[in-house]
């Protein structure tokens, strides 16, 4: 059995001539030394497809499925709690706080929404149906059942989900609203950024103004497409980058990006998700209980 309190990463061993699984892992992940892998194996943190521990003597076999539990020493706790809004046999809906990653990545393993929900609900089969950025707060949907998962994933793939965000950004008195903003989004530099390109638009966002307060306005953003950083780049391209965004329009210094300032969260909230349930046919509407302060 896989541990219910954590989600393993999975690797299908590539073709090669390594004598053992351990040798393959050491070459595949050069940043992790051999002793670390030995310690993980000794603690049952490296498993095969049946959930059986793999030890240092296990012979290598191309295509073998290996589950391993990523570990980050001294992982910094995120001092904000998620809120579970809905649970049924197929779906879990949660409000994610700012600064909490949805999935394990980089320096975040246990301090993720997925790991927290798996522990709280005792369900190791939870899988996010979509994702929002670590710095964004608001609604995230999880599949709680393997059999029905594909039906809900198809909703997002086919753009059958109405998504509404709120953002606080500088005022744009010179532009008419509501408006539809289309961009050609291409990979930028560094690799984790996106930028506006010269080709045909591949992203579309509907924008309206909800509230005006001096030099700052509250906007409703409805993405039709789902590009990486779409809302953040779209507002920056209009000259109204989302407040407290360390990436757009200007990339903050590395030292500032690597140190979360809990007093200055990104002013972006996944407010509402609406769709027709693929199983029951009922209209489903979920709204975040979080708010964006000015």
Predicted regions and their residues:
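RNA pseudouridine synthases
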Residues: 1-294
């Amino acid at each position: 059995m896989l541990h219910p309190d954590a989600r393993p990463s999975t690797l299908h061993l590539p073709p090669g001539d390594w004598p053992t699984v351990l040798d393959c892992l050491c070459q595949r992940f050069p940043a992790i030394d051999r002793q670390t892998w030995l310690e993980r194996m000794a603690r049952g943190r490296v498993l095969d497809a049946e959930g059986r521990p793999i030890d240092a003597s296990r012979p290598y076999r191309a295509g073998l499925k290996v589950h391993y539990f990523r570990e980050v020493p001294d992982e910094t706790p995120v001092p904000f709690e998620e809120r579970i809004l809905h649970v049924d046999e197929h779906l879990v809906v949660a409000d994610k706080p700012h600064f909490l990653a949805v999935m394990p990545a980089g320096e975040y393993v246990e301090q993720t929404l997925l790991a927290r929900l798996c522990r709280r609900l005792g369900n190791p089969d939870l899988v996010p149906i979509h994702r929002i950025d670590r710095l964004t707060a608001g609604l995230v949907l999880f599949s709680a059942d393997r059999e029905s998962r594909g039906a809900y994933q198809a909703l997002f793939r086919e753009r059958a989900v109405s998504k509404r965000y709120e953002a606080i950004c500088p005022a744009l008195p010179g532009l008419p609203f509501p408006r539809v903003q289309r961009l050609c989004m291409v990979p930028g530099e560094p690799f984790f950024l996106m930028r506006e390109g010269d080709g045909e638009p591949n992203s579309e966002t509907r924008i309206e103004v909800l509230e005006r307060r001096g030099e700052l306005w509250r906007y409703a953003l409805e993405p039709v497409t789902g590009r990486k950083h779409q809302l953040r780049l779209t507002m920056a391209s209009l000259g109204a980058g989302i407040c407290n965004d360390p990436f757009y329009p200007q990339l903050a210094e590395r030292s500032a990006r690597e140190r979360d300032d809990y007093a200055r969260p990104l002013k972006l909230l996944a407010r509402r998700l609406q769709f027709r349930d693929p199983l029951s046919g009922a209209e489903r509407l979920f709204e975040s209980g979080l708010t964006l302060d000015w």
